[in-house]
Amino acid sequence: TTHSEVSAASVAVPTVSHLEVARALMKAGVDVLIEKPLTTSLAEADELVATAARTKRVAQAGHLERFNPAVRATLPLITQPMFFEIHRLSVFTPRSLDVDVVLDLMIHDLDVVLSFVNSPLRDIRAVGLPILSDKVDIANVRLEFESGCVANLTASRVSTERVRKLRFFQPKQYISLDYGRQDVIVFSV
């Protein structure tokens, strides 16, 4: 197959190779969907974005949770989010150890929360620790928004069970979203 026959490609290689592979494809005239995380560093991400602009190609990060039916069903329910509690826990496996747990797992929840809260960030507090690898394996982030909304996110790849839940509160309402089961439970008063 020649590049002229390929209009788009999915880049699903180890993160350390994302920039090299995506750059070569874009220079060959191919749009790219890149599995998350986009790259291993901000400098590489900037270079990838610049390459896309220079070659006039589309480079899209594969933040697939935004297309999860539960996330899509929840978006219209959000009126005045006040507090989020998000847990994404995974049993340890040797995959994706080239990046920390924030870029491997939490990035999905950051993407979703930022799409749910229509307010600039005021403060970010974070802590993370390497437990079973030389990268951060467990992390907690607290996002505070100008609107007063707060989001607490925990991601871990050191767990005995898989948990992928987002819970949030707004006036007279509690909403629980399970990414894995793709369901939403709404409690209203």
Segment roles from a protein language model:
Residues 1-49:
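Beta-loop-alpha module in the N-terminal Rossmann-like domain of NAD(P)-dependent dehydrogenases
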Residues 16, 39-96:
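A contiguous active-site-proximal alpha/beta segment in oxidoreductase catalytic domains
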Residues 28-30, 55-58, 149:
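A short helix->loop->beta-strand "cap" motif at the edges of active sites that frequently abuts
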Residues 34, 59-61, 177:
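Hydrophobic residues in well-ordered beta-strands that form the structural core
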Residues 62-69, 92-123:
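Mid-domain beta-loop-alpha active-site segment that forms a flexible
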Residues 110-183:
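Contiguous beta-strand/loop segments that form the cofactor/metal-binding neighborhood of enzyme cores
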